[in-house]
A protein has these predicted regions:
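Intrinsically disordered, low-complexity terminal tails enriched in acidic/polar residues
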Residues: 28-42
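Conserved nucleotidyltransferase catalytic core and NTase-mimicking acidic/glycine-rich helix/loop elements
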Residues: 46-168
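General "foldedness" signal
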Residues: 19, 26-28, 68, 96
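Generic structural signal for short, solvent-exposed loop/turn connectors between secondary structure elements
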Residues: 9, 27, 43-49
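Histidine (H) residue identity feature
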Residues: 19, 36-39, 68, 84
Length: 168
C-alpha cells in the first residue's frame, strides 16, 4: 500500500497513513510507519552501513521481502536486528546460531522468552518496539528462516562478496 517514485534522482517510497497519536488508535497496518521511523531515526544513524549490508545480504540470498510470495526479511526487521546486535558482523555471528523460536525483545516488554513463545509461534520472534503485541518477523517463513541461518553460517565460515549478489 505505498507509492514508489523517483524524485530528483532519489528512489522514494511514499506510505499513506492516518495520523494517530498511538498504535492503539491505528486504522490500518501502515499507520505504524511513523512510529517505526521515530523509534529508529536517531538510534540507527551510526549503523546505517551495517543495515545496508544486511539488506543487500538478504537480497543476495533471496530472503529479502516480507511479501507473501517471498516470506523473508522486511527492511524494518533488518534495521531492528542490526540495532539489537550492534552491527552486521555481530548479527551474522548470532544468526548463525539461531534456533526455531528465537526471541528478540529490544525494549524488554516481556519478563522471559517463555512468555513470548506462548504468544507467538513463528520461527523468529522480534517484538516491535512500538507495539508489544506485534512480531515484526511474522511474515518470515520457516523455509526462509532456515535458508538465512545456513547463509549466515556459510558467510561466517568464509566471508565473500558472492553473498551480496542475487542469482541472475
Amino acid at each position: 500500500p505505498y507509492l514508489n517514485a523517483v524524485i530528483e534522482g532519489y528512489d522514494v517510497d511514499l506510505v499513506p497513513c492516518y495520523h494517530v497519536s498511538s498504535t492503539a488508535e491505528m486504522k490500518c497496518a501502515v499507520d505504524r510507519t511513523p512510529f517505526h521511523t521515530r523509534y529508529l531515526i536517531d538510534k540507527i544513524a551510526p549503523l546505517r552501513e551495517d543495515v545496508l549490508l544486511l539488506k543487500q545480504f538478504c537480497k543476495g540470498g533471496g530472503v529479502y521481502g516480507s511479501d507473501h510470495m517471498t516470506g523473508g526479511f522486511s527492511g524494518y526487521l533488518c534495521e531492528l536486528l542490526i540495532l539489537h546486535y550492534g552491527g552486521f558482523t555481530q548479527f551474522m555471528e548470532a544468526a548463525s546460531k539461531f534456533r526455531y523460536g528465537e526471541v528478540i525483545d529490544i525494549e524488554g516488554y516481556y519478563p522471559d522468552r517463555k512468555s513470548v513463545r506462548a504468544l507467538f509461534t513463528e520461527p523468529l520472534i522480534v517484538i516491535d518496539p512500538t507495539d508489544k503485541s506485534r512480531n515484526v518477523a511474522a511474515a518470515l517463513t520457516p523455509t526462509r528462516f532456515s535458508e538465512f541461518i545456513e547463509l549466515a553460517r556459510d558467510y561466517c565460515e568464509k566471508p565473500g562478496s558472492c553473498y551480496f549478489i542475487p542469482d541472475a
